[in-house]
């Protein structure tokens, strides 16, 4: 009888242990899954802000849409805002990715404790995987947008210098014109160095080449005028006018379409991964 009672006590203790283990496992898994789900939801909540940032990639082009009323300071301010937003997006993505990595690590600590909730843990893991894939895409988009923005900053600065050059020359202020020309050369050089940035069409490199030629021809014209070689200056002005016409033929809409065609698939993939993370 004593042996039988001992067996019953041992079985009862074992059952209590199993029930306790299962209960503890469920509690631990529930806490970890809730933390992971909360982290994923935070990442998903940033989707609209990041999409707005990515949509501003082509906004940087709008300042050239009406070249007759081109406002260099306004255009540069627009680009600076876009770059600042992209840099903020990059920081947000990095912070979110660290949070997701920590949440994923937490889900899989001491896996023997969460065996009873493996299916739920796997679902949370899958959500984290999709969210991190979305962030990897977002990180590359933000980095590309920063580089592209720096190109537009340099280009718009160069175009602003060109406007100032024309104003100074028309006012007969040759020293002022030369100063503007020097700034233009520096800014165009910087734009040319960035023209190969990811997502920028080849036409933009050609545009910086045209601006280089314009700066060189303008320098020749100013030199001729300073030396009072007015016939030579008049002949060179024909080249300057041709340069201006070529630059004025810059196809803003066509460039915008190419930029959009390059970035749109990546933006779509980002949104698809976010949608998968919410499933």
Task: Indicate residue ranges for each PLM-predicted region.
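Leu/Val/Ala/Ile-rich N-terminal alpha-helices, chiefly Sec-type signal peptides and the beginnings
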Residues: 2-141, 258-279
